[in-house]
Amino acid sequence: EGEECESGPCCRNCKFLKEGTICKRARGDDMDDYCNGKTCDCPRNPHKGPAT
């Protein structure tokens, strides 16, 4: 009861991590990716350039 997710970079103890939690650290000129509090996936930072 009350489970929001099973697993993923933005899921801990069956709950979504709060919005703004870093789920992927930046590399080089890249930018950090943050959880949005609504999904267990790590959404791509909208301010990044195209994926390479």
Curated annotation (Swiss-Prot):
Is Disulfide bond tagged as a keyword? Answer: yes
Q: Where is this motif: Cell attachment site?
A: 27-29
Q: Which GO terms describe its cellular component?
A: extracellular region
Q: Which domain of life is it from?
A: Eukaryota
Which cysteines pair up through disulfides? They are C5-C14, C10-C35, C11-C40, C23-C42
| InterPro entries to which the protein is assigned, alphabetical | Disintegrin_CS, Disintegrin_dom, Disintegrin_dom_sf
Instruction: Provide the Disintegrin domain boundaries.
Output: 1-50
Q: Name one GO molecular function term.
A: toxin activity
Expressed, tissue-wise, as follows: Expressed by the venom gland.
Q: Where in the cell is it found?
A: Secreted
Oligomer status and interactors: Monomer.
Q: Which family does it belong to?
A: Belongs to the venom metalloproteinase (M12B) family. P-II subfamily. P-IIa sub-subfamily.
Q: What does this protein do?
A: Inhibits ADP-induced human, canine and rabbit platelet aggregation by binding with high affinity to alpha-IIb/beta-3 (ITGA2B/ITGB3).
Miscellaneous information on this protein: The disintegrin belongs to the short disintegrin subfamily.
Protein name (record) = Disintegrin multisquamatin
Species in which this protein is naturally found? Echis multisquamatus (Central Asian sand viper)
